Regions:
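Structured, contiguous alpha/beta core segments that scaffold functional sites
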Residues: 8, 139-302
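C-terminal anchoring/interaction modules
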Residues: 1-20, 24, 288-534
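An N-terminal domain-start capping segment
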Residues: 29-56, 112-113, 182-213, 299-321
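Long, contiguous amphipathic alpha-helices that act as assembly "spine/axial" helices in icosahedral shell
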Residues: 55-58, 62-63, 100-142, 253-288, ...
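Flexible coil/linker segments and helix-coil junctions enriched in charged and small residues
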Residues: 87-91, 181-192, 436-440
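Short, mixed-charge, low-aromatic patches
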Residues: 57-68, 76-84, 94-95, 220-226, ...
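Extended, helix-rich architectural segments
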Residues: 1-183
Length: 534
């Protein structure tokens, strides 16, 4: 069975998910998942929704997930030495040196990601995940590429593990550069030709080889394998990343966030259409003139603003819709639905009041962030870990970073759920310290709280590396000793000055005492000028 036939067979199981994704896309971002699969998208056929709430919440949630998964100012992972190997094979004293080297490697990896188009493609994939629930990312040599749900099919086992992926894309004949049949020579039953004669359909088949345990993929065009298109990759570092937003046991495809709240979106769409059309009808001004009136309709039509015409007021009337109460009911319901949708997509709505404290805004924001926990769990497993493994493999193969021993070094994800956990730890720690300071006073806080341990825990909660930033206990003790020595020397100099002013140190009466005092002053000054020993 060739790739085209395999794609068509697996597409039957995708149809129900694709239809639901198209419905969700039509209410939010219609251009994400279009109705036409065989030709290039024609945006003239896209229907614009009557409301923009769906588009707003999708874009906002995608931006939040983007910043949480790949934060721009920090790393989303940490390279750490396995604790069970640290005591056996590595000297614990070199732990700080390893952390410093790992931090340099982490910055190199983040610089590589920042210089690429990864964030742009990942943001696009997140919008597909929120709307359609599925997305496919290919990590190629030239960067990342996103496949929407109508361009790929996937086959999974009962546990959700990927067994097979088949993609379909339109590629220009000039780009392929192969000896392809001319337009019109293909068979009428051959679906590899598209409506555009310059484009051909190329299928990519991705399978997991059971014998070698590696991913194998190749491309076909006109049911023939394209020469040089066969490639392989390790099982844990595949460039093909099929992503899901929500999973259901036994289903090959995921469910999107929009599908969970599509009822409110459909209701808001209907109410918005009714309000817009009703408001347009109510805004239309039509005058009625009594047939027995002496005032002619032409007189009213031709009268300018502020003009004076002859007539009786009761002969002229204005048509009124009289649906103000009905419009108010629909508008109130639309506002309630919009508020529910904003809460569902984690869009913060601050209470409209004269006095809204910063603490209330902070608690609202923290409550919204806690709702991201379930979303992060699946994205961490299906996206961040495979994405990091593939990036490490690419950089190690190109010798941009040194090869890391897998049995000693283990990368760990610190973004997503872990970042939310650290944020809660920071919040609890600051509240605990603040409560002690307010109830018992600053003196009790300094007496019972260990400052160095509190600083370390705050830095760990915020994901800050304290290496060479926070002073160690040895450095603090050394500085205290230096301060004590300087204080003692200063006291000795002051005492010597007081003794020098006494009558017993008069050179005319006691010459030997003056010489001894001079030697003590010189010795104290030399000790004070000596640099501190490290």
């Amino acid at each position: 069975m060739n790739a085209r036939e395999r794609y068509n067979r697996l597409a039957t199981g995708r149809s129900q998910f694709l239809d639901k994704a198209r419905d969700c896309s039509s209410l939010t971002l219609p251009y994400l998942i279009t109705q036409d699969d065989n030709t290039r998208s024609n945006h003239k056929n896209l229907i614009t929704p009557w409301q923009s709430v769906g588009a707003k919440v999708v874009v906002t949630l995608a931006a939040k997930l983007m910043l949480a998964l790949l934060p721009p100012q920090t790393t989303f992972f940490k390279l750490q030495v396995r604790d069970d190997k640290l005591g056996e094979e590595l000297d614990p004293s070199i732990r700080s040196e390893l952390d410093l080297s790992f931090s340099k490697i982490e910055r190199m990896i983040m610089d590589y990601i920042a210089a690429s188009n990864d964030r742009v493609v990942i943001h696009q994939a997140l919008k597909h995940l929120i709307v359609g629930g599925n997305a496919l990312i290919f990590m190629g040599k030239d960067g990342l590429k996103n496949f929407p749900l109508n361009r790929f099919v996937v086959n999974r086992d009962g546990n959700g593990n990927v067994l097979e992926i088949v993609t379909k894309e339109l590629i220009s004949r000039k780009v392929l550069g192969l000896d392809l049949p001319e337009p019109g020579e293909e068979s009428a039953n051959d679906s590899s030709k598209s409506s555009n004669d310059d484009d051909v359909e190329v299928y990519t088949c991705v399978k997991l080889d059971e014998k070698s345990g590696r991913w194998v993929w190749y491309q076909e065009c006109f049911d023939k394998i394209i020469p040089g298109s066969r490639s392989t990759a390790p099982k844990n570092a595949s460039p093909w990343l099929p992503l899901r937003f929500n999973t259901v046991d036994g289903e090959d495809y995921g469910r999107g966030r929009v599908e969970e709240f599509i009822g409110d979106l459909k209701s808001l769409e209907g109410l918005s259409q009714a309000l817009v059309e009703g408001s347009a009808a109510a805004a239309k001004v039509v005058f009625l003139v009594s047939p027995s009136s002496t005032t002619k309709p032409q007189t009213i039509a031709q009268a300018g603003n502020g003009a004076i015409v002859q007539g009786r007021p009761e002969d002229v009337a204005v048509i009124q819709v009289g649906k103000t109460a009905d419009f108010a009911t629909a508008a109130n319901l639309a506002q309630q639905i919009e508020r529910r949708i904003s809460d569902a997509f984690l869009t913060m709505n601050v209470r409209q009041a004269e006095r809204v404290t910063a603490e209330e805004v902070r608690l609202t924001q923290m409550e919204l962030e806690q709702q991201l926990g379930g979303i992060f769990s699946l994205l961490t497993v299906e996206f961040l870990i495979p994405y990091l493994n593939r990036t490490l493999l690419i950089l190690q193969r190109s010798n941009q970073i040194p090869k890391l021993p897998k049995d000693l070094v283990r990368p760990s994800i610190v973004a997503g759920v872990n970042a939310l956990g650290r944020g809660q730890d920071r919040e609890s720690l600051t509240q605990f310290i603040g409560t002690i300071a307010q109830t018992l006073g600053p003196e009790a806080l300094m007496h019972f709280i260990n400052p160095s341990e509190a600083i370390k825990r705050l830095a760990a909660a915020q994901g800050i590396d304290v290496l060479n930033l926070v002073k160690t206990e040895e450095q603090i003790q050394q500085e205290q000793q230096q301060q004590q020595q300087q204080a003692a020397q200063q006291a000795m100099l002051e005492q010597a000055g007081q003794i020098a002013g006494s009558p017993m140190m008069d050179p005319s009466k006691n010459p030997e005492g003056t010489d001894a005092l001079g030697e003590q002053i010189v010795e104290a000054q030399e000790q004070q000028q000596e640099p501190p020993q490290e």
